[in-house]
């Protein structure tokens, strides 16, 4: 039996190989296969947002001015969500709502679904870009894993939450003041600050900020100096063989401060990765729960006692009254189509009034 050994040669004109060679070529800005998703989606999402905040009104969906053309500034302009009556329609330009009319499409809130969907796929493309480039240079994929956390938050807040409610109307509009209003809405209708998933998210974000500050300061404090000159730190040389800072000195310092300290760099940096990523993932899970109208902590016994005893009130019961006030004022403003009217006697009043 004869066995022929040799290199298997593919057709040189193979389209996949040609594209792969061009897309993954070493250039100033890496493109890659992920770039086919990232660059068009990011371009359309940003372009839609700039177009909406510059020219498009929210009069037909929210009864608001929301563009620079109407007198808004950077903090008050927004690309607003579609009207509640449009439910979960994708609002395609060629769909039954706009019927190819670009002006009508903008008036109906079509730019919001356009920006939200292209933005979500653009973020996913950016995560895939990190994964693809890491494989190309033989790195671990932890950058991509870390970036999955803000993607989870974006998808849960802008897509999953309104999908669980009656329509895109209840998602945040794309603007600074608009998102502040959405946060107030979350507090009033879901008591979000008392939700344990929100607490984990806050602990993750603030804990990560603390870890970054401590880590940066510690590294600066323990840099190996390489002479007396102002610019003679060999740490600026990317090919240095020696360490940049003294882990041993840092370990001794924090051992004296706290009594405990990280003993190796792997555990230290994994912890710095773990804290914010886990916090953001937990908050994303919490928002998915809110999409299903799951409730946070309820201390009903305190509410009952506060209702019966005029002299008893806690910070919790005061916050519950605040939430009722937010709901009473916000519902009538945000949902004028519901014709909600709250007489004076049903508006919340604290025991102090």
From Swiss-Prot:
Q: Name the positions where Fe cation binds.
A: 215, 269
Could you tell me the membrane topology recorded for this protein?
Answer: Multi-pass membrane protein
Sites of Phosphothreonine modification: 2
Which keywords does this Swiss-Prot/TrEMBL entry list? Acetylation, Chlorophyll, Chloroplast, Chromophore, Electron transport, Iron, Magnesium, Membrane, Metal-binding, Oxidoreductase, Phosphoprotein, Photosynthesis, Photosystem II, Plastid, Thylakoid, Transmembrane, Transmembrane helix, Transport
Enumerate the residues binding pheophytin a. 130, 143
| Protein localization | Plastid, Chloroplast thylakoid membrane
Transmembrane stretches in the record are 41-61, 125-141, 153-166, 208-228, 279-295
The UniProt record gives the binding positions of a plastoquinone as: 215, 262
N-acetylthreonine: residues carrying this PTM: 2
Q: State where chlorophyll a ChlzD2 binds.
A: 118
- In which domain of life is the source organism classified? Eukaryota
Q: Cofactor: bound how, per the entry note?
A: The D1/D2 heterodimer binds P680, chlorophylls that are the primary electron donor of PSII, and subsequent electron acceptors. It shares a non-heme iron and each subunit binds pheophytin, quinone, additional chlorophylls, carotenoids and lipids. There is also a Cl(-1) ion associated with D1 and D2, which is required for oxygen evolution. The PSII complex binds additional chlorophylls, carotenoids and specific lipids.
Q: Which GO terms describe its molecular function?
A: chlorophyll binding; electron transporter, transferring electrons within the cyclic electron transport pathway of photosynthesis activity; iron ion binding; oxygen evolving activity
The record's Gene Ontology cellular component field reads:
chloroplast thylakoid membrane; photosystem II
Q: Which reaction does it catalyse?
A: 2 a plastoquinone + 4 hnu + 2 H2O = 2 a plastoquinol + O2
For the ligand (chlorophyll a PD2), the binding residues are 198
Q: What is its EC number?
A: 1.10.3.9
Q: What does this protein do?
A: Photosystem II (PSII) is a light-driven water:plastoquinone oxidoreductase that uses light energy to abstract electrons from H(2)O, generating O(2) and a proton gradient subsequently used for ATP formation. It consists of a core antenna complex that captures photons, and an electron transfer chain that converts photonic excitation into a charge separation. The D1/D2 (PsbA/PsbD) reaction center heterodimer binds P680, the primary electron donor of PSII as well as several subsequent electron acceptors. D2 is needed for assembly of a stable PSII complex.
Q: What does the record note on quaternary structure? A: PSII is composed of 1 copy each of membrane proteins PsbA, PsbB, PsbC, PsbD, PsbE, PsbF, PsbH, PsbI, PsbJ, PsbK, PsbL, PsbM, PsbT, PsbX, PsbY, PsbZ, Psb30/Ycf12, at least 3 peripheral proteins of the oxygen-evolving complex and a large number of cofactors. It forms dimeric complexes.
The miscellaneous comment for this protein is: 2 of the reaction center chlorophylls (ChlD1 and ChlD2) are entirely coordinated by water.
Record family assignment: Belongs to the reaction center PufL/M/PsbA/D family.
Q: What is this protein called?
A: Photosystem II D2 protein
Biological source species: Vitis vinifera (Grape)
